[in-house]
Amino acid sequence: MINIRPDEISSIIREQIEKYDQDVKVDNIGTVLQVGDGIARVYGLDQVMSGELLEFEDKTIGIALNLENDNVGVVLMGTGRQILEGSTVKATGRIAQIPVGDEFLGRVVSPLGVAIDGKGEIVTSDSRLLEAMAPGIISRKSVCEPLQTGITSIDAMIPIGRGQRELIIGDRQTGKTSIAVDTIINQQTEDVICVYVGVGQKASTIAQVVNVLEEKNAMSYTIVVASSANDPATLQYIAPYAGAALAEYFMYKGKATLIVYDDLTKQAVAYRQMSLLLRRPPGREAYPGDVFYLHSRLLERAAKLSDKLGGGSMTALPIIETQASDVSAYIPTNVISITDGQIFLSNDLFNSGIRPAINVGISVSRVGSAAQTKAMKKVAGKLKLELAQFAELEAFSQFASDLDEATQKQLARGTRLREVLKQPQNSPLSVAQQVALIYTGINGYLDDLPVSNVKSYCASLMTYLTTSKKPYTEIVRTTNQFTEEAESSLKEAILESKEAFSKTN
């Protein structure tokens, strides 16, 4: 008979108990009740958070938006064609995030951070929440540095500062995207990281923007986030937040960033579609009640950070499309009230050949003037008033037959100033060039030239300033001030180039 030793058995059992490691994994799992139109109703997800990512059986990802008594309303980030009624859904425990990093520069990505430009996968270790909190009051600093757009009429009359939110608003086909793209191109020498977000655009339009940026060597400091018109509404809704997260990554590293949302009208339409399908009560123009918050929480993320946080900035240029120039519609008035000013583009001006077609009368920048360079402030101080008076006089002069000499002079100068401010697409100007053009126009040096010759003379003046080695350009470029020396140098250049121009024309 075997001699059993109880103490040995008990020590073996004790050892086994100590070694026993039960790895319990608890998954929050639900069942699909109904699916269709990019929306799924899920039963059984009791522990789910608002905004949490959910994974379906076919690996489609969804976001939990509606938390109701007996089910959860989920918006799908895909077609959802493989999702069946009764299939299981797993809560991931994660809120929507996007990978971020320097590796994204020069790339075209989807709102989920996946490369769609055929240049290979983007590998990065950092990520940021799509819906990050905007910087608080203490974290901010007032706007104090200029963001040069390279467009004379904007930099002179509607100046934009780093950390500002300036709305670009106008009807379709009035040059809204062109202004934004020109601003990105102009950042080549400014050390500004740019993010272009295309929301609900045609794929061909986004490709065109990318081609222009590549031609102008601007893609090296630009990220394009693209959600085209055939993407699900969910992707169009999150695209601006994805762009903001990418820009924030650079902003918190102390860099200056510029983000363009093209355009927020389409994001609002996508959000309306999702909300109506989720059976949320509709409000004005069938938009849900929180459509203001949709845009305010996005645009509040643009800021000029305090020196303690690195002094980075994020300048936002949201674009809104109006119908028949109606700026009093719901979405335009919402975004106008959130932003720090607006650039209004007029259909009539565009069709009459004035491009960029900026309506100076109702365009305004509420904080940018504090950031305007001293050189520009000194020269362009009277420009906006002069053009506003000219527009008024021009309207009255259509009814009056005989005008006094002073009025005729003012009309003649206004016409020439308007010519000076016309600018071809994708050809931004430096501050020194802009100051020279405005100085020439506002001080009457163009009054004796025929209107048809103004553009060609301005081009010859720019060439003369570049080739004649006048100290003017260097003074303005290095000091950002229009000193007496710079002024006398510019006067000489104007008179000399005018003399040469009159001989050839």
UniProtKB/Swiss-Prot annotation:
Q: Name one Pfam family in it.
A: ATP-synt_ab_C
- Could you tell me what this protein is called? ATP synthase subunit alpha, chloroplastic
EC? Answer: 7.1.2.2
In what way does this protein cross or attach to the membrane? Answer: Peripheral membrane protein
Task: Indicate which residues the UniProt annotation says bind ATP.
Answer: G170, D171, R172, Q173, T174, G175, K176, T177
Annotated function: Produces ATP from ADP in the presence of a proton gradient across the membrane. The alpha chain is a regulatory subunit.
Has keyword Ubl conjugation? no
